[in-house]
């Protein structure tokens, strides 16, 4: 059984139909771009493993390359899980340690004389990884697949020009709990789907839910009520209560603040004398 599942009927998903739809979408985008090879950064987590499985479903395992990019503080189990996922789906994969690249930047977690900064040091890791992914994509004349989900997209829980950078985003429309349903259907390794605590591994001991301050099932339900249904915090809480989901108005306010405060991350960079682009999450 998956670690998380949607808790409101509006978020229930037909995995077989969804996989077919995403695979068709991916094939279309690669055909438009005139490319054949997909490059996927594989962390050992559910999002990247699911993205890998979808790429194989769409393009065939011979056209998918996985890159596993640990650094000094990456738990060994993450590398093992990533390798297991790559082997489960039968794709070519490479493991490259990025520790020395991070050290060359003089980040605080690697250079004792520099204080560690959660914002700059932690965000450097996904940005370095994205550089490596695009290097390989250029070498292979391929496209980089993003591994971010809708929950991360709406809350801004991603690094600009890091894990937020990609050529195609096949699971950006799926909430985190929906990703687990798809992962289970695709055959992502059981430990990743059933047991593993979601974490961006930005620093030792970091977890997604600890940083966000709310569990994923409740967060997804609140996001759906606030964004997709367009309800205010009080009405969102009442609406969820009718569906058996307990949440507080304080929770709803906090989630809405995450959406609003991260809107700049979802818009293209503004330019002088250009219309201010709308936040895709808050329009329509």
From Swiss-Prot:
InterPro entries: NAD/GMP_synthase, NAD_synthase, NH(3)-dep_NAD(+)_synth, Rossmann-like_a/b/a_fold. Pfam families: NAD_synthase. Deamido-NAD(+) binds at residues 127, 167. ATP binds at residues 41-48, 147, 176, 199. Residues 264-284 are annotated as: Disordered. Residues 275-284 have a biased composition (Acidic residues). One of its GO terms (biological process) is NAD biosynthetic process. Mg(2+) binds at residues 47, 152. NCBIfam families: nadE, PRK13980.1. This is NH(3)-dependent NAD(+) synthetase. The lineage of its organism: Archaea, Methanobacteriati, Methanobacteriota, Methanomada group, Methanopyri.
């Amino acid at each position: 059984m998956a670690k998380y599942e949607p808790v409101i009927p509006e978020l229930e998903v037909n995995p077989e139909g969804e996989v077919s739809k995403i695979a068709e979408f991916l094939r279309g985008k690669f055909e438009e771009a005139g490319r054949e090879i997909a490059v996927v950064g594989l962390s050992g987590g559910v999002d990247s493993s699911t993205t890998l499985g979808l790429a194989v479903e769409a393009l065939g395992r011979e056209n998918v390359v996985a890159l596993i990019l640990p650094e000094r503080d990456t738990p060994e189990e993450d590398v093992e899980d990533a390798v297991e996922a790559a082997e489960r789906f039968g794709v070519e994969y490479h493991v490259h340690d990025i520790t020395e690249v991070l050290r060359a930047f003089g980040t605080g977690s690697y250079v004792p004389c520099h204080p560690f900064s959660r914002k700059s040091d932690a965000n450097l890791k996904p940005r370095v990884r994205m550089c490596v992914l695009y290097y390989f994509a250029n070498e292979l004349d391929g496209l980089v697949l993003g591994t971010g989900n809708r929950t991360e997209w709406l809350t801004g829980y991603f690094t600009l020009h890091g894990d937020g950078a990609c050529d195609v985003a096949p699971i950006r429309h799926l909430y985190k709990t929906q990703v687990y349903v798809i992962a289970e259907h695709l055959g992502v390794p059981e430990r990743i789907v059933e047991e593993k605590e979601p974490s961006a591994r930005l620093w030792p001991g970091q977890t997604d839910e600890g940083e966000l301050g709310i569990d994923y099932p409740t967060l997804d339900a609140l996001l759906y009520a606030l964004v997709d249904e367009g309800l205010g915090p009080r009405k969102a809480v009442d609406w969820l209560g009718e569906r058996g989901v307990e949440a507080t108005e304080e929770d709803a306010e906090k989630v809405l603040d995450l959406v609003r405060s991260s809107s700049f991350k979802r818009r293209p960079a503004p330019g002088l004398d250009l219309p201010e682009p709308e936040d895709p999450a808050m329009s329509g």
